[in-house]
């Protein structure tokens, strides 16, 4: 899984129990991200089960994945679990490869009735060659092979990260639960990357941009108290988050231009890593949420207050500061039509730090805010085996621009509005399905142009069927509509459709599974970096690829 966009790395999912996509106005509760929703990763816990799962996979482009998930009970009050993963692969792109190692032990202690303590440790080492895609010409990506590489043969990225977390839950009684969390994350990273610049004729300019974290640390503390009765669910909480970044940066702009249709690659200069700036971002928040149910009607409300402070020290320059206090909110109604169907309406506002708070730009001295309005319906059919959901939404974001004195001189306003339809669950005991469709009308309100890399139509379908006792077959289709790279719809990325298939055979403790991705060999654009640079850093998606896996449970 790609990170949040600021770490420039990938996160292993080997110790993740499930990935929750929390759609809608979650921003006021969590205080981070957009009112459009968040992604929540739920880690595996040491719950006292005794098992060991071993999995190995081989696939296209010399891909190999090895995983171990082992759980044990040391005593009636202490449990342990450990997840390990090693990945290595070449790529469909020439000169691009990766090598990762991940280990995540966790211990659960039950010191007394109603008390649970979870201690987590995660360590990851990652080596990869950064891929910056292909340039564009005349409003389209250049038509070259997906394997084309425009970087330097000595480009690299190497990172080491360590995360330590503790979670303490105290069930005071049947109605009250008090949860406290603390986590510390430390990452050191170096990247040497050769990037495309501006296209002139059939040549594209290039620069080498080196950057690193030396280090980047994140400290998080959170406390929540939940009171739950038959008719009321109330949560009050507080959290503290601090990000410290020691950024190194250097560049070399002396590279000769490269031919866009026939890139000849070789080693590029390495300008090293020089101290550039130190940043500290501190956020302290308190929040309250309440859900009160009266008959078939539930009223939802929550409010959050944040105090945010940013400090920045660039090498050889005066210290810069940015601080503000903001209030986010959410309100909603849910009406239960019958035991199987409900309708709802909600509105929310949340605040975001420019550039996710990782640095200060004097021209963006005001925080962004996002407003969401949504109405929808949800139904559970076939004895709750199948969930249906429909929603109509509108998201407005305002990004104030300021002068060097912090005065607002302009506002960039964007609107995303559309519909979303979803069905997920079991049609029969043997047949699972997950299908979704979204229509999204997104535009810059001043220009009427689409934002970077936002599609108007999205459709996905995945279904599996249990064929006989041992066999399970599945397949899916994904469609992504027309998109553009860069501002003002500078480069048309087009639409695409991919088809994936799978087959699995299980007998006893053994499981063999085959996966085929993009089986029709669709040539498509996966995405582009945001802003002006995205017009010449456009990534092709993978052609047809295959994976064969074997798993055994002890």
Question: What does each model-found stretch correspond to?
Answer:
Residues 167-171, 177-193, 343-344, 367-442, ...:
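Membrane-embedded beta-barrel scaffold of Gram-negative outer-membrane proteins
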Residues 162-187, 205-315:
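Face-selective signature of the C-terminal outer-membrane beta-barrel domain
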Residues 135-149, 199-206, 248-275, 320, ...:
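Surface-exposed loop/turn segments flanking beta-strands in extracellular/periplasmic regions
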Residues 51, 58-89, 93-131, 154-176:
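Transmembrane beta-barrel wall of Gram-negative outer-membrane proteins
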Residues 1-49, 54, 350, 375:
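Acidic, small-polar-rich N-terminal luminal/periplasmic segments of exported/outer-membrane proteins
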Residues 110-112, 216, 231-235, 239-242, ...:
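Structural signature of Gram-negative outer-membrane beta-barrels, strongest in the C-terminal barrel
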Residues 52-54, 80-82, 117-119, 178-182, ...:
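Transmembrane beta-strands of outer-membrane beta-barrel proteins
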Residues 228, 296, 394-396, 410-488, ...:
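Gram-negative outer-membrane beta-barrel transporters
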């Amino acid at each position: 899984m790609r990170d949040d966009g600021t770490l420039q790395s990938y996160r292993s999912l080997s110790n993740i129990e499930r990935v929750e996509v929390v759609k809608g106005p979650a921003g006021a509760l969590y205080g981070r991200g957009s009112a459009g929703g968040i992604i929540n990763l739920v880690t595996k816990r040491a719950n006292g089960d005794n098992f060991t799962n071993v999995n190995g996979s081989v696939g296209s482009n010399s891909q190999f994945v090895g995983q171990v998930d082992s759980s044990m009970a040391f005593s009636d009050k202490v449990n342990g679990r450990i997840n390990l993963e090693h990945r290595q692969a070449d790529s469909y792109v020439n000169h691009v490869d990766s090598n990762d190692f991940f280990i995540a032990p966790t211990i659960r202690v039950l010191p007394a009735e109603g008390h649970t303590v979870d201690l987590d440790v995660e360590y990851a080492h990652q080596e990869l060659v950064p891929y910056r895609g292909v340039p564009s010409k005349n409003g389209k990506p250049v038509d070259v092979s997906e394997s084309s590489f425009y970087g330097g043969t000595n480009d690299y990225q190497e990172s080491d990260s360590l995360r330590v977390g503790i979670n303490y839950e105290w069930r005071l009684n049947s109605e009250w639960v008090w949860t406290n969390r603390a986590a510390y994350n430390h990452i050191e990273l170096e990247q040497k990357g050769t990037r495309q610049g501006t296209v002139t004729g059939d040549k594209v300019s290039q620069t080498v941009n080196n950057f690193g974290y030396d280090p980047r640390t994140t400290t998080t503390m959170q406390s929540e108290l939940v009171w739950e009765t038959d008719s009321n669910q109330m949560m009050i909480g507080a959290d503290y988050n601090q990000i410290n970044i020691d950024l190194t940066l250097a560049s070399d702009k002396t590279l000769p231009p490269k031919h866009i249709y026939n890139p000849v690659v070789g080693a590029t200069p390495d300008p090293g890593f020089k101290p550039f700036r130190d940043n500290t971002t501190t956020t302290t928040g308190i929040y309250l949420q309440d859900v009160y149910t009266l008959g078939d009607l539930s009223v939802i409300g929550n409010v959050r207050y944040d105090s945010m402070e940013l400090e920045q020290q660039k090498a050889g320059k005066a210290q810069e500061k940015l601080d503000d206090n903001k209030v986010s909110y959410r309100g909603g109604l849910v009406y239960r039509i019958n035991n199987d169907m409900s309708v709802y309406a909600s509105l929310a506002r949340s605040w975001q730090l420019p550039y996710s708070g990782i640095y200060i730009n004097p021209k963006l001295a005001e925080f962004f805010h996002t407003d969401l309005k949504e109405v929808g319906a949800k139904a559970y059919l076939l004895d709750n085996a199948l969930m249906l959901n429909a929603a109509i939404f509108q998201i407005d974001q305002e990004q104030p621009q300021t002068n060097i004195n912090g005065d607002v001189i302009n506002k960039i306003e964007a609107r995303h509005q559309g519909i979303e339809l979803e069905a997920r669950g079991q049609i029969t005991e043997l047949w699972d399905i997950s299908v979704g469709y979204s229509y999204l009308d997104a535009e810059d309100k001043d220009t009427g142009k689409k934002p970077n890399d936002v599609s108007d139509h999205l459709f996905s379908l995945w279904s599996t069927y249990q064929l006989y006792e041992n066999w399970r077959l599945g397949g899916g289709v994904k469609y992504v509509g027309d998109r553009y790279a860069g501002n003002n719809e500078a480069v048309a990325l087009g639409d695409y459709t991919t088809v994936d298939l799978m087959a699995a055979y299980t007998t006893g403790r053994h499981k063999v599974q085959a996966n085929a991705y993009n089986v029709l060999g669709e040539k498509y654009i996966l995405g582009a970096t945001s802003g002006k640079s995205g017009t010449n850093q456009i990534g092709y998606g993978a052609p047809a690829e295959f994976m064969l896996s074997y798993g055994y449970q002890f």
